[in-house]
């Protein structure tokens, strides 16, 4: 029997007034679907899992999580982080996997579920581009440090003649030089305190003066790109292109190495780190909770930001990866594996890094480990190299391993983000060759990344990360969840999951998606915006023009949502604006599984549910709120 009309997505008209859908497949649509080329699938499910691990278990775990934790309560930060993981991270991650696999579409095309929300996809693409550009600059730094790690002596371990108040980072010499300089400084009565505080390690001065040639301010411009970092940036983009040039056929094979190799290095570093003197103190410092921080709303905000950053939620790569799955792939298992492994890796990375920093503090005779830690980029390229240079045995080997690990982690993250952009373009323009789009976007990524390898590049990185990445992703993730769960409807969405997985959706997911996840995200976002303060880099506030540029960047990303919604309503007019607006909130005729046969089965499945619920509604005669509770518990079938 051919289904001529689509019931209102199995929703009772009296109780699902917000969730109606009038999908009416016709012969023209079916013919169009048959003519479209089939989407490439992963060679096997393990490639998908490894790809998700490579993007979710990345720089966010080894580079960002440790200093975020110690800045927000140490071990106490793990409590809000784990709570946020279960109430926001896991639900959002699973939701994005589902929507990608169900539709076999990228970040923009999935919004046939609610066409006026297509701006969410474009806004996420904008944020993804911002993140890609500065991520690639971090890769350039890792390539540079990896290359110089093979010198007979690590170049950041000793001072240059023109570096004033510098202390060598060599093992024993560091402490000796520090004590000598401090003693000399203290002998100068009026200048003692000033000179002591000016002492800097050779690793810090090497990074600031030799590698990035940092400017103290950017009021007079950011300067020209450094030629060495430009070459390193170019090498990074060549590797990225080679990995993604054939789509999932090439990136899927590379995912095994990108996902597993970092663990080999991480465990090797952990094995070495825990044997160092002072390592236990560093680990205790990392895990020791500061309970008072649990009542600080900023800590909870940082937990959400870290969760999004680490899992790559809200940027599109999870949706993109899942869109290449078979329709019946078991993604629930994969979602649980990746989100759990991500948390464990963050803990592993934190313990490893703080064991090394504990040894650094021990060598420097410093009681407070906080005094030897720098946040942001400085953690990876100042604190870690400083600690590694003090290793007694072959520091070059551990340095090369560490920076190669960072490079692999960065490649895994950027490959996913870049593939998201390429997929969006190829989904929109079906005739485009994937490798040509990959090459064009890689060239654009390289050119945009040049701004970050200038003397003022770290200033720009801080600005773009704060305004173009963090907050844009945050607000669009709220709209993403609202569009799927509140507009399309929780029950409709759960019906689709049941059809795809042949299993009912548990109460945990229903409650999180409909209540806990969106409410927590909205409250934290509002608090963040109300309490936001001007950003600064290296204890220096940005000039007014910098803050203005940042807000413009945020506005451009966030404005994608209303602008594309307005465009859709204007180009799909009905009798009145109100009718056009309401129609834009309903799924289009393109919504649903992309495979024609699967789509036909889905329509029949939804039709049967609608008939059953109509009978139940007449016999039960439930009140509105009772029916809502009944649906929430998943007993409406």
Swiss-Prot record:
Biased composition (Polar residues): 1-17
Keyword Transmembrane attributed: yes
GO biological process, one term: neutral amino acid transport
Compositional bias ranges of the Basic and acidic residues kind: 26-39
Pfam families attached to this UniProt entry: SNF
Transmembrane domains' residue ranges: 48-68, 75-95, 128-148, 225-245, 254-274, 303-323, 337-357, 397-417, 443-463, 470-490, 515-535, 549-569
GO molecular function: amino acid:sodium symporter activity; D-amino acid transmembrane transporter activity; L-amino acid transmembrane transporter activity; neutral L-amino acid transmembrane transporter activity
Membrane topology reported for the UniProt record: Multi-pass membrane protein
Subcellular location: Membrane
Keywords: Amino-acid transport, Glycoprotein, Ion transport, Membrane, Sodium, Sodium transport, Symport, Transmembrane, Transmembrane helix, Transport
Sugar attachment sites: 181, 195
GO CC terms of this entry: plasma membrane
Domain of life assignment: Eukaryota
Primary site of residence: membrane
Cytoplasmic side stretches: 1-47
Region (Disordered): 1-39
PANTHER family: SODIUM-DEPENDENT NUTRIENT AMINO ACID TRANSPORTER 1-RELATED, SODIUM/CHLORIDE DEPENDENT TRANSPORTER
Family listed: Belongs to the sodium:neurotransmitter symporter (SNF) (TC 2.A.22) family.
Purpose of the protein: Unusual broad substrate spectrum amino acid:sodium cotransporter that promotes absorption of the D isomers of essential amino acids. Neutral amino acids are the preferred substrates, especially methionine and phenylalanine.
Protein name: Sodium-dependent nutrient amino acid transporter 1
Organism encoding this protein: Drosophila virilis
Upper lineage: Eukaryota, Metazoa, Ecdysozoa, Arthropoda, Hexapoda
Encoding gene, per UniProt annotation: NAAT1
